[in-house]
């Protein structure tokens, strides 16, 4: 589980968990959503024999949607990697934004975690509701 989620659970108070709240907390955080169903698992996706992305390197930068929150960290990056036989680099953290001036913003993570010397064929940046809901 992501450290931010754990911190959020602790901040919400352990009493909710102690009072039968574990099920409710898991349900609220997405662990019982359809995205976790076996029928949606990335391993079931057939790959394309011919794809313009085959063997290409694709970078995905984003927040929870890119990370695959509520789908056990399987999201469109894994789907595209499997379907199109490409190399995916996923840099995603729940609750982050493009514009915040903090250590886990998209820009900071791109600077800190993505090798500028790496050959990249496609760059996909997920703009999220986190940006719209923050100052």
Give the residues covered by each predicted segment:
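N-terminal secretory targeting modules
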Residues: 1-61, 65-72, 81-83, 111-121
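Conserved SGNH/GDSL esterase-like catalytic core that processes O-acyl groups on lipids
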Residues: 57, 65-135
